[in-house]
Amino acid sequence: MSDDNSGTENKVIFLGEAGVGKTSLIKVSIGEKFETTYNSSISLSYFPRKININNKKYTFNLWDTIGQEKYRSLTKIFYKKSKIVIFVYDITDINSYNNLKYWIDSVNNELSNEKYIKAIIGNKSDLFLKEAISEKEAEEFAISNGAKFKTCSAKTDPLVFTNFLDQLFTEYILENEKNNNSQNEQNITINNKKNKNKSKSKCC
């Protein structure tokens, strides 16, 4: 759970094929070192990341999911109540890019009645000489799916991703505060109208 003023959990899930670097991105974003050895995630887990926005403290729980196909039905269980969904592909692996459509459609089906921020990350940009899909094409795909887009390398430049992640957090919090303020104003207007109607009925 988060320790922010709203008292609600700010859930962020990372989705994509096995080996694209979801775990690495999460770990470097919370200050851990990049690990050169690769071990595929075999369980769902989350890592808390704290951030200050407008002098308030917020905690976002970064959920690391299992990319293997045989675990996909299990992963779907954790889509609910996600505030931010980050789809990750490996820029050197065309299959991981092509399978983004599966992940996006899967989330859209599960969260059809929920509002959330989408982002697509092209990881392993340090291997640009082996690029299997152009950055321009990937960005156009992201835009067509209503998602933010960024290429980065968890290995060589983790700050690029960390800063991008903070931008997503800030966008979510500010939009949430805006919606809450708007709802509060509507409630005040409704209450004022009720009070006026009560006063009129008493006068009669």
Each language-model region and where it sits:
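Short acidic active-site motifs
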Residues: K70-L74, S96, E137, L159-V160
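Conserved Switch II/interswitch segment of TRAFAC-class P-loop GTPases
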Residues: S82-K101, L111, D126-A132, K155
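Switch II (G3) loop of P-loop NTPases
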Residues: Y58-S73
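Generic enzyme active-site microenvironment
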Residues: L62, V88, I121
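Preference for well-ordered, secondary-structure-rich cores of eukaryotic proteins
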Residues: N10, I66-G67, F78, K83, ...
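Conserved alpha-helical scaffold flanking the Walker A/P-loop in AAA+ ATPase domains
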Residues: F47-P48, R72-I77
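Post-Walker A helix-loop "phosphate-sensing" segment adjacent to the P-loop in P-loop NTPases
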Residues: G31-N39
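Conserved P-loop small GTPase signature centered on TRAFAC-class small GTPases
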Residues: M1-T23, K27-G31, K50-K57, L111-C204
